[in-house]
A protein has these predicted regions:
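Short alpha-helical transmembrane segments in multi-pass integral membrane proteins
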Residues: 4, 11-59, 117-184, 226-282, ...
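N-terminal transmembrane alpha-helices
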Residues: 46-83, 97-112, 116, 141-148, ...
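Transmembrane helical elements of multi-pass membrane transporters/channels
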Residues: 57-76, 178, 189, 212, ...
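Transmembrane alpha-helix boundary and packing residues in multipass membrane permease domains
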Residues: 62, 66, 78, 115, ...
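Residue-level hotspots within pore-lining transmembrane alpha-helices
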Residues: 68, 72, 102, 106, ...
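Helix-terminus/linker motif at the lipid-water interface of multi-pass membrane proteins
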Residues: 71-90, 159-166, 222-229, 289-322, ...
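Small-residue-rich hydrophobic transmembrane alpha-helices
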Residues: 89-149, 186-205, 312-376, 407-429
Length: 500
């Protein structure tokens, strides 16, 4: 049953500033009724106000969170690399990949739940939100057990297929099995963080991530450097941090979003809600898994060019990752913006958001790409002093970074469409540009003797993806979306959004 919360109405006559303040107060009271949320939460209103401002406020904590994650990865590598041997370092690096492949599908399902939460939030459907959260938690426990078992017993076989060096194999199995015990915490934290983002609260997910990263770093130093536990210590630190972040996210949600009645343990589910989560989440999860496998295929072409070329591509990835942080942040904002405004029936605002947020992402990444390209050699020199490695890294940077803006626009458009729940088209496009464009182009360039320029396939796939997503807005599917939004009720006529 939907909450009986009237939508804000336009006000005529009187002082415009007073009317706007009164409108804002009524809207704030409505969203508090829906979630039962405390006034100090970091929830961003995506349905009203300046589109760019709300998207930027939402994206900024995610951007900082991505930087934190990269910082943690660097510290983790430094600790293991300095207090363990090279075999242990190799084991930690390789053992994470099987877990990522196993978790991809289920993390995609979590993203599906986040999209549905944003849509229910746009509708102000309190009962729907509560049942959706219960169903997501129930499904979380259902998934955690088989994934843990698969990781424990199938993981070693995956490590053999990856040709893990013999001296690192036992370490890798140990790391994999200990971190597999953290599957429930991993899936739980990502599910809860997705729900909070769906509500528009990205600031809280940053704080939760900060707690997790700091815990992980402190325990890494304690277990590996102080207690000398080696690989087992690094794995245990990761597992404890995952469970702490999961439990903290539950406590936070129960305190600040009382209306959601956030459960710790499974407490019933709704078949229709579960079917909706799977309908959106399974294609996203399969897309993630196949995309990961596809990256391995492209990496194989890079490996054929020799260790110097691979090293160059590796450090160039650090620089291109700067633009990647901005792209991920804008794309996350696009998903939630689309979901909430579709749920509220704000089709015209949704149209403006597609243009404004994708253009903002394109401009920001274009500037980052140009600056990083111009100063790429001194930046890359921070990671290596080998002239041959630097030459390969500079070549990679020049082939990719100047065109990274096309990926930003393409990815934001794709995120908008995902936010509306139309994930089939984006899944097909994503797999098409990887398996029909990027991978064949890389192997063709290698076969023609241009293997050291095979990274050009990346920029080519970005351009094809951009054209494919532009084509979506000419398809009947976009027209269906417009009719769906109209059925939900167009609230844009009552909007008093400031002019940008």
């Amino acid at each position: 049953m939907q909450m009986d919360c009237p939508r804000p109405t336009a006000y005529n006559g009187g002082n415009e500033e007073k009317e706007r303040k009164l409108y804002k107060d009524i809207w704030k009271s409505e969203r508090n009724v829906v979630c039962g949320m405390a006034s100090h939460t970091g929830k961003i209103d995506m349905i009203r106000g300046s589109i760019i401002k709300s998207a930027a406020l939402f994206a900024l904590p995610i951007c900082v969170g991505n930087i934190l994650q990269q910082l943690y990865g660097t510290v983790d590598t430094l600790v293991v690399g300095n207090f363990c041997d090279s075999a242990a370092l190799a084991a930690v690096g390789t053992a994470t990949q099987p877990m990522e492949i196993l978790l991809c599908v289920f993390l995609g399902i979590g993203n599906g739940a986040s999209i549905l939460v944003s849509q229910e939030m746009g509708r102000r459907n309190a009962d729907g939100l509560r049942m959706l959260v219960r169903t997501a938690v129930w499904f979380l426990y259902l998934c955690a057990i088989p994934v843990t078992i698969l990781a424990m017993f199938v993981g070693p076989a995956l490590l053999r297929l990856m040709q893990v060096p013999a001296d690192a194999f036992d370490y890798a199995v140990l790391y994999l099995r200990i971190t597999a015990l953290g599957t429930l915490g991993n899936l739980g934290y990502n599910m809860n963080a997705g729900i909070l983002r769906g509500l528009g609260d990205s600031r809280s997910t940053l704080l939760l991530l900060l707690i997790s990263c700091l815990t992980n770093i402190v325990l890494d130093v304690a277990f590996v450097a102080v207690l000398g536990m080696g690989v087992a210590g690094a794995a245990l630190a990761t597992t404890i941090a995952l469970y702490l972040s999961w439990l903290t996210s539950i406590l936070y949600a129960r305190r600040n979003y009382e209306g959601l009645q956030f459960p710790l343990l499974p407490h019933g589910y709704d078949k229709a809600q579960l079917a909706a989560i799977l309908k959106v989440g399974v294609p996203l999860g399969l897309n993630n898994s196949l995309y990961s496998v596809g990256h391995v295929a492209v990496q194989a072409v890079y490996n054929m060019q020799g260790s110097v070329f691979v090293a160059g591509c590796s450090i160039a990835g650090r620089v291109t990752g700067i633009a990647g942080i901005a792209i991920t942040s804008f794309s996350s904002a696009a998903v939630v913006f689309a979901g909430q405004n579709l749920g509220a029936g704000n089709y015209r605002r949704l149209q403006r958001g597609v243009v404004q947020i994708t253009c903002a992402a394109g401009v920001v990444t274009l500037l980052i790409g140009l600056v990083a390209t111009v100063f790429c050699r001194p930046l890359l020199g921070l990671f290596s002093s080998d002239p041959a490695v630097l030459d390969a890294a500079v070549r990679y940077t020049w082939w990719v970074l100047p065109f990274i803006w096309t990926y930003a626009v393409f990815n934001c458009m794709m995120s908008f469409v995902n936010g509306t729940g139309a994930v089939k088209y984006t899944t097909v496009v994503n797999l098409l540009i990887l398996w029909a464009v990027r991978i064949p182009a890389a192997y063709i360039l290698h076969a023609l003797g241009y293997g050291t320029s095979s990274m050009a396939c990346v920029s080519l796939s970005y351009a094809v993806g951009l054209v494919a997503m532009l084509g979506y807005f000419l398809t009947p599917e976009w027209g269906k979306l417009r009719r769906k939004a109209k059925e939900l009720g167009d609230a844009v006529t009552a909007e008093t959004e400031p002019t940008l």
